[in-house]
Amino acid sequence: MRIVFDIGGSVLVPDDPDIDFIKAIAYELTKISEDHEVAVVVGGGKVARKYIKAAKTFTPNETFKDYIGIHITRANAMLLIAALGEKAYPFVVQDFRKAWEVIQLKKIPIMGGTHPGHTTDAVAALLAEYLQADLLIVVTNVDGVYDSDPRKNPNAKKLDRITVDQLVDIAMEGESKAGGSGVVDALAAKFIQRGKIRTYIVGKKDAYSLFDVIKGKHSGTVVEP
């Protein structure tokens, strides 16, 4: 299979880098790459949102703030590259054609953000579409898709299996400004819909066993194309 992994920045670096988690997913990604083609997109998470919030003091320019977030995602991507060692391409990949070339070299391409206005979820969905991936796995700090934000609604219900149309409807309720923190943003959901990409959305606990996740063994949400 060809698999794209979308690793949330807040999962990788909650406040400080989660060294044990980074080691664990580096091991899992290495193991998976022995039998499958793998590409990874890393988010900015809480650190990016802190920088974006601070920048609001100085500028109302959303595009400028997006660029700040992009730089943070690439710093997080470099951290994962370091953990993967020789298995990863040694530089942060910044376009999809290069990601394809790296895969042909039997290396794992690691990407961060690419363009203002696109979250790393959107980048991952576009990458999966470009690569014609069999599977997109989104690792986030929420253990799946809920019918409302579980961080705000204690009665929110987790959805084990949804259609991509349902994902778009749920995502449309989220915000689209720089630093938005929905499980999957609306633009990413629309790209998943357009690309007809089978997607698993899982939490950090499941991510410790990504080798099982790709087999469908997880407690997250399956998004059917």
From Swiss-Prot:
It is found in: Cytoplasm. Inhibited by UTP. One of its GO terms (biological process) is 'de novo' CTP biosynthetic process. Its main location: cytoplasm. It is an enzyme of class 2 (transferase). Gene3D superfamilies: Acetylglutamate kinase-like. One of its GO terms (cellular component) is cytoplasm. ATP binds at G9, S10, G45, R49, T140, N141, Y146, D149. Keywords: ATP-binding, Cytoplasm, Kinase, Nucleotide-binding, Pyrimidine biosynthesis, Transferase. Pathway: Pyrimidine metabolism; CTP biosynthesis via de novo pathway; UDP from UMP (UMPK route): step 1/1. PANTHER family: URIDYLATE KINASE, URIDYLATE KINASE PUMPKIN, CHLOROPLASTIC. Belongs to the UMP kinase family. NCBIfam families: pyrH_arch. Homohexamer. This is Uridylate kinase. It comes from Thermococcus onnurineus (strain NA1). The gene is pyrH.
